[in-house]
From Swiss-Prot:
This is Temporin-1Cc. The keyword Acetylation does not apply. Disulfide bonds: none annotated. Its main location: secreted. Antibacterial activity against Gram-positive bacterium S.aureus. The modification Leucine amide is found at residue 13. Expressed by the skin glands. The keyword Amino-acid biosynthesis does not apply. Belongs to the frog skin active peptide (FSAP) family. Temporin subfamily. It comes from the Eukaryota. GO terms for biological process: defense response to bacterium. It comes from Lithobates clamitans (Green frog).
């Protein structure tokens, strides 16, 4: 799981 993906998820949520 990439940290960059986590940032996108947080942005969407």
């Amino acid at each position: 799981f990439l940290p960059f993906l986590a940032s996108l998820l947080t942005k969407v949520l």
